[in-house]
Amino acid sequence: MKFQLAINMERISPDTDMAAVERHTLEMVQMADAGGFHIVWAAEHHALEMTIAPNPFQILTWWAAHTDRIRLGTAVVVAPYWHPINVAGEAALLDLYSNGRLEFGIGSGAYQREFDRMHAGLKQTDAWRYMQEMLPAIKALWQGDYAHEGEYWRFPEATSVPKPLQKPHPPIWVAARAPITYDYAVKHQCNIMSWPLTRPMSEVETYLERLQTALDENPGQSRPTFSAMRHTCVYDKKEDWMVPVEAARRQLAQFENLFKNAGGVDNGFPAMIDLSTLENRDEYDPKMLHEHLMFGTPQEIVGKLRLYDDLGVDQFTYYASLGLGMKEQKRSLELFINEVMPEFAED
């Protein structure tokens, strides 16, 4: 099993110093690079302090200059906020700058609040259509001159300048949850990023079943790489289990606000809504969070990861950004690198 790191620059309150956040994030990425992580992912979000990522290509170019071998992924470029020519050129330039380390992840976006500001009138549930139109256009632009007449974009003949270093193009990933996205990924030979949120292991099993169904319905297509992401925190003593759980509950209260457009945002800081008022409140029970998320001592984490490995998860994504203190984040990553990853070393 290979390992990926997903990390954001995050400020939980106005008291958090941005320069310290910047330094900490880069140090975490450098730890992952030195520790043998396969990919590090940068997100795209707008006007939110909890995920400071207005342009993933800029973030990854920054990380590329300070790392040696780790691959650099967008997770994800939000298709409705971009034009295909912009994305093709930005991605190709990053691939050149990083000496061919780009992993290109594309998706449809998550928060209705962002759509209301970045693409007024678009419902989050309809945004997948933009992703499915954009990706073939980007691949064509990487190959040469191409004109596009689609539902959402139209442009005369153009090409990507520059072209990607990797041939025929960088590895492509799509964020997938719904069956239609798994079918699209298999048909277009895209790797799959899955995120079961706070749900139990059965959610991962469901995603893998959707992948198998898509493969069965598209004979002749090869199986893409399948990754699963979880909030992750490794700690020294079992009695510390509530530290990441409490941090996760605070962040998830902000996530639900943004996902459901159910609360306010003050100068970039989302309010935390009352999780007990939600229909899905059982998903945020502390003991369930401890069980379902990748929280535990090194030995406990190894046991949890064995379940993912046995299911057929190819790569696990360590989601580091859950509002923990910087010291706790670094200790967690250190324990994961030194005491967990060696148990999954490839022969």
Give the label of every model feature segment.
Residues 32, 36, 44, 63, ...:
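Conserved, mostly hydrophobic/aromatic
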Residues 7-23, 77-85, 166-176, 232-235, ...:
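Active-site mouth loops of central-metabolism enzymes
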Residues 39-63, 78, 115, 195-201, ...:
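Glycine-rich, proline-tolerant flexible connector loops at the mouths of alpha/beta enzymes
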Residues 1-72, 167-170:
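N-terminal beta1-alpha1-beta2 module of alpha/beta enzyme domains
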Residues 2-19, 80-148, 192-193, 198-205, ...:
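Flexible, glycine-rich active-site loops centered on histidine and acidic residues
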Residues 50-74, 130-134, 333-347:
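Alpha-helix-loop-beta-strand connector modules within alpha/beta enzyme cores
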Residues 3-7, 40-42, 72-74, 102-106, ...:
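Hydrophobic faces of well-ordered beta-strands that scaffold small-molecule active sites
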Residues 124-161, 202-313, 347:
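An alpha-helical appendage that flanks or caps ligand/catalytic pockets
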